[in-house]
């Protein structure tokens, strides 16, 4: 609070008595009983209006307000040049100090002194300005390699001092220990994502900010698979992979690299998969195919043979002709046996 500089003179005896009693006669921190309830401490949120209550005993008594040793008001005279301060005048006895848009610089002790015909009476109020939490510094988004040690930083101000907590935003999100720093040792790909810092002190809503962590890792091929391949028709092989940065895919048949548009081959590459399609399968297309996935951290591959379909039908282990012959033989033997038993029965 900006107060008028020293140099103002006392123009009447009661003001001199007030100043002398406040600055000389009363020990620091001493309070005198009032006929009204005294307020020892007041909590006000930053930006709000604080009203420090003080009352005169009668219309003849005079009052004064001080902040530490600086005079704010003496009677109806304002000594402070701060436009935010004023005296409340709800009634003749009301001599409350009003401070608009309070700030942390308004923190501290305030003294109201009432000068009567006998002795001055004083009341002290300690004003505490509470400040909502505010995160003023947090780690930037980062990209690091898997296995690296990481420290995330989140700094905040507020009064009371805010409690800082961290949370990993993921399907298996779990809170970490409170603190300005979050240490992650040997970070894994599963620990990539957004980390949320929250600063809270119950004065207002928590202040929340996020850090995005990208974890690079070498590619892996999770699956390589083909569908039914029939000569004269289309066939495809699908290669599923993962890696950060996203891997680049290549295809080989044996030792020969394949390219899109070569001999009826179509290659479609995506961030996590590659699809090789043969538009018109011939005998030359059968063989061993290899999918290669690579990024700046490494290379991996997986192979799959592309074979022609089997000519044997389900449940049949021989030719149709052989099966027909066996069936005919079985019928012939059955007929011979039946005739033999019938002849024996007639003879008996």
Curated annotation (Swiss-Prot):
Keyword list, A-Z: Cell adhesion, Cell membrane, Disulfide bond, Glycoprotein, GPI-anchor, Immunoglobulin domain, Lipoprotein, Membrane, Phosphoprotein, Repeat, Signal
Keyword Lipid biosynthesis: no
Disulfide bonds: 54-112, 154-197, 239-291
Span of the signal peptide: 1-31
Positions of post-translational Phosphotyrosine modification: 181
Pfam family, one: Ig_3
Tissues in which the protein is found: Expressed in brain.
Gene Ontology MF term list: transmembrane transporter binding
Main location: membrane
Source superkingdom: Eukaryota
Domain Ig-like C2-type: 32-128, 133-215, 219-307
Membrane topology: Lipid-anchor; GPI-anchor
Lipidation positions, renumbered (GPI-anchor amidated glycine): 318
Localization per record: Cell membrane
Glycosylation sites: 67, 149, 269, 280, 288, 301
Record has Secreted as a keyword: no
GO cellular component: dendrite; late endosome; neuronal cell body; plasma membrane; postsynaptic density; side of membrane
Propeptide segments, given as residue ranges: 319-348
Biological processes annotated in GO: brain development; cell-cell adhesion; cholesterol homeostasis; fat cell differentiation; feeding behavior; lipid droplet formation; locomotory behavior; neuron projection development
SMART domains from the UniProt entry: IG, IGc2
Family to which this protein belongs: Belongs to the immunoglobulin superfamily. IgLON family.
Functional note: May be involved in cell-adhesion. May function as a trans-neural growth-promoting factor in regenerative axon sprouting in the mammalian brain.
Protein name per UniProt: Neuronal growth regulator 1
Gene name for this UniProt entry: Negr1
């Amino acid at each position: 609070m900006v107060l008028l500089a020293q140099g103002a003179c006392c123009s009447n005896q009661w003001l001199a008595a007030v100043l002398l009693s406040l600055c000389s006669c009363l020990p620091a921190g001493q309070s005198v009983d009032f006929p009204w309830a005294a307020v020892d401490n007041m909590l006000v949120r930053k930006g709000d209006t604080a009203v420090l209550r003080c009352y005169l005993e009668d219309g003849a008594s005079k009052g004064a307000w001080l902040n530490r040793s600086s005079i704010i008001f003496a009677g109806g005279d304002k000594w402070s040049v701060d436009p935010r301060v004023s005296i409340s005048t709800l009634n003749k006895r009301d001599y409350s100090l009003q401070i608009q848009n309070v700030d942390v610089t308004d923190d501290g002790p305030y003294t109201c002194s009432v000068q009567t015909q006998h002795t001055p009476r004083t009341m002290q109020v300690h004003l505490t300005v509470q400040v909502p939490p505010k995160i003023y510094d947090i780690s930037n988004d980062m990209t690091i390699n898997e296995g690296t040690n990481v420290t995330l930083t989140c700094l905040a101000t507020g009064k009371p001092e805010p409690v800082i907590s961290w949370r990993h935003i993921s399907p298996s999100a779990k809170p970490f220990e409170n603190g300005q720093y979050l240490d992650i040792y040997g970070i894994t790909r599963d620990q990539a994502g957004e980390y949320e810092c929250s600063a809270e002190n119950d004065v207002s809503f928590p202040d929340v900010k996020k850090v995005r962590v990208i974890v690079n890792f070498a590619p892996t091929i999770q699956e390589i698979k083909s569908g039914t391949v029939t000569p004269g028709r289309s066939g495809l092989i699908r290669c599923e992979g993962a890696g950060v940065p996203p891997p680049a895919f290549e295809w080989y048949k044996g030792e020969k690299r394949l390219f899109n548009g070569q001999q009826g081959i179509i290659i479609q590459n995506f961030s996590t998969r590659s699809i090789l399609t043969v538009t018109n399968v011939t005998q030359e297309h059968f063989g061993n195919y290899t999918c290669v996935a690579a990024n700046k951290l490494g290379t991996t591959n997986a192979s799959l043979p592309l074979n022609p379909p089997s000519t044997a039908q389900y449940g049949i282990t021989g030719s149709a002709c052989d099966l027909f012959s066996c069936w005919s033989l079985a019928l012939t033997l059955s007929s011979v046996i039946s005739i033999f038993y019938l002849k024996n029965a007639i003879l008996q």
